[in-house]
Amino acid sequence: MDGLEDGPLDASTATSQKPQRQVRLKLTSRHEDIALPESTGPILVPTGLRRYALSTLVNNLLESEKPIPFEFLINGTYLRTSIDEYLTANGISAETTLDVEYVRALVPPLHVASFLHDDWVSAVDVLSDTSIAGSKSRVNAGQERILSASYDGLLRMWNMSSETIALSPAAREGGHTASVKCARMVSPSQIISSGLDRTVRLWKYTESEDGFSASITPQLELYGHKGSVDSISMHAQSHRILSASADHSVGFWSTRKSENPAAPESLLPSNTSRSSKRRKLNSSVSVPQRGPLALFKSHTAPVSAAIFDAKDPTVGYSTSWDHSLRTWDLVTGTLVDTRTASHSLLSVSHMPELSLLASGTSARHITLIDPRASATTVSALTLRGHTNAVVCLARDPDSTYGLISGSHDGTCRIWDVRSTRTDKDGVMGESIYSIPRKSVGGAGKRVGGEGVKVFDVCWDKSVGIVSSGEDKMIQINRGEGVLPNGGSDR
């Protein structure tokens, strides 16, 4: 069984029910290990065939020892009906030879584990052999680490046995003085975080030789924002950080203390009256303090996210509650372009192979935006399915077309941007899987995601889909090859 809805149907069954039209299919795959010989020509099949029968046909042609469940794309769209229904719906003649791409069928991501915290979990990241932070070093299987940030003001490092092996210092020992909103691994030995205390912080991460214990030590405090710093991103090779703040600005920083200017005196804890008590508690810890390389002030509402271009670290993108996505030249600090959507933009992820930016909105959908100046429309595609704000996004590490989103509706949804339909509002995408919070149990969905809002999500090839939220949980889901790869070799 391959878990998809349509049942067994072969050519003989289809043709015995009633006379069928026939159509020629040119079957191709982008994967050499499952590709048919180049000499394979168009194949004449009944138009009544559905996915299951086509999958059986391809397996027979491949002479597979063990059947492989396949999905089929025609003109970039997954076949979800019979071929006949597809032809009728799209006004295509059965005399046409259809180019049909086949890919391995999707595998549902199953729940693997949940890690309980003391408070809401605002952010998660992964250190593994396949993560960006771990790509330059060797992280053995089973030695992966999960970083979490919480509303209790602390960072935690977890092993894969759900044990906390490191905890960041409390405020009086150089830690955050309010809730942490975001945290990311820079490398196996460095962490960055930001939060409601208006700071961006760098930490040194050190593990014992046996890996059973570790430490998170403050290295650098970065001051410049006048509001909560809700999102940060990192480009390790250039040692640069981008931050998104509720003060309407985007911060640009260096992880190197010597490259940052002095911190603005007016923003230091010692010069803010409301922080005097906290400063006394911190008096025993001395952490270097620096300011930003630049603050970009063009947005007219809180900035929700800021990221580097995945292929060019001199370009940055930011999204905001002011409905705009802005493109920045990080070398000159100038605003290059502004794209204005219909709703507040709350999250962003780059899909460079498609020249698109995915942005989650307050209107419960994801809009795919082409940031290039030559683009004639703002939204190239809309992904619908969530029932509350979409606050976090992550790319599928294996597929050019894959994306996962996290929402305040209490679910994560997996998307393949090739899975689309056209209606009166244009081209729409529909999610392939919805991942509920395990903490809900058998109670089903909660209205508006009450108590189980998702705050962050990370998709790692080794560990799986790691999400966090209002239920005080890190949740790990895994499905081998959740999406078929469509643009690069694994």
From Swiss-Prot:
Principal subcellular localisation of the protein: nucleus
Coiled coil: none
Subcellular compartments: Nucleus, Nucleolus; Nucleus, Nucleoplasm
WD repeats: 116-168, 175-213, 224-263, 298-338, 340-379, 385-425, 449-487
GO biological process: maturation of 5.8S rRNA from tricistronic rRNA transcript (SSU-rRNA, 5.8S rRNA, LSU-rRNA); maturation of LSU-rRNA from tricistronic rRNA transcript (SSU-rRNA, 5.8S rRNA, LSU-rRNA)
Keyword list, A-Z: Nucleus, Repeat, Ribosome biogenesis, rRNA processing, WD repeat
Gene3D superfamilies noted in UniProt: YVTN repeat-like/Quinoprotein amine dehydrogenase
Transmembrane segments: none
GO function term, MF aspect, one: ribonucleoprotein complex binding
Region of interest (Ubiquitin-like (UBL) domain), ranges: 23-104
Pfam families given in the database record: NLE, WD40
InterPro entries for this protein: G-protein_beta_WD-40_rep (IPR020472), NLE (IPR012972), WD40/YVTN_repeat-like_dom_sf (IPR015943), WD40_repeat_CS (IPR019775), WD40_repeat_dom_sf (IPR036322), WD40_rpt (IPR001680), WDR12/Ytm1 (IPR028599)
UniProt-annotated stretches for the region Disordered: 1-22, 255-286
GO cellular component, one term: preribosome, large subunit precursor
Keyword Zinc in annotation: no
Function: Component of the NOP7 complex, which is required for maturation of the 25S and 5.8S ribosomal RNAs and formation of the 60S ribosome.
Family: Belongs to the WD repeat WDR12/YTM1 family.
Quaternary organization: Component of the NOP7 complex, composed of ERB1, NOP7 and YTM1. The complex is held together by ERB1, which interacts with NOP7 via its N-terminal domain and with YTM1 via a high-affinity interaction between the seven-bladed beta-propeller domains of the 2 proteins. The NOP7 complex associates with the 66S pre-ribosome. Interacts (via UBL domain) with MDN1 (via VWFA/MIDAS domain).
Name listed for the protein in its UniProt record: Ribosome biogenesis protein YTM1
Organism encoding this protein: Ajellomyces capsulatus (strain NAm1 / WU24)
GN (gene name): YTM1
